[in-house]
């Protein structure tokens, strides 16, 4: 009921009975498998899919690789944008997240990982946890929107779906950065902010491809 998207698939009705997967990725996996046909129906005629999840729990960690498998089998460009738990959530949740990322990495074209701990590099350390989660949700949204806008937005130089596919197909682990600036040299400052974002899980050194978009 809290999800406002137009089409929803309620996975695992028989397995979890609406109770969640309780940090058990196997239950999350079984839940997605239970509704495989419904997921396939929703993904029909789709060219590109973004999978977003918080790794470390049962549903996101277990179900996301299954959905990725379905999408790849259907020839869909599959991009996962996921988070890793805060350190204070405990070593067990972090271990589950790492195991889930290992499975997911081989099942998507492009994997973007945002460590939750990095959020405190851009917000005050005293920020309440719920507010921190809100900020992380905003970053996930902006990451997906930034890629989608490259295809849909009009500009002097347009990027089409073929360009996106050329860079993101079988790309492996990737990073995303967003920079905003104003005034003199704003473009250069925004680029510097984007490539040096404290949220990046790794450097862009050695990257085989780059998608770069400027708007404003």
What role is predicted for each listed range?
Residues 1-216:
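Tubulin/FtsZ superfamily GTPase core signature
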């Amino acid at each position: 009921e809290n999800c406002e998207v137009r089409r929803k698939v309620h996975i695992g009705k028989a397995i979890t009975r609406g109770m969640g997967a309780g940090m058990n990725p196997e239950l999350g996996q079984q839940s997605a498998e239970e509704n495989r046909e419904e997921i396939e129906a929703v993904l029909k005629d789709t060219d590109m899919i973004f999978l977003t999840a918080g790794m470390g729990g049962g549903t996101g960690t277990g179900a996301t690789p299954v959905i990725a498998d379905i999408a790849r089998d259907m020839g869909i460009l599959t991009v996962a944008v996921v988070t890793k738990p805060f350190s204070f959530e405990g070593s067990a949740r972090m271990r589950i997240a790492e195991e889930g990322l290992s499975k997911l990495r081989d099942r998507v074209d492009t994997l973007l990982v945002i460590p939750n701990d990095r959020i405190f590099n851009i917000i005050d350390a005293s920020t309440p946890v719920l507010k921190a989660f809100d900020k992380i949700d905003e970053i996930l949204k902006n990451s997906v929107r930034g890629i989608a806008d490259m295809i849909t937005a009009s500009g002097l130089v347009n990027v089409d779906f073929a360009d996106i596919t050329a860079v993101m197909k079988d790309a492996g682990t990737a990073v995303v950065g967003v920079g905003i600036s104003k005034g003199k040299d704003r473009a250069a400052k925004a680029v510097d902010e984007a490539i040096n974002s404290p949220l990046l899980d790794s450097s862009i050194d050695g990257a085989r491809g780059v998608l770069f978009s400027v708007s404003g």
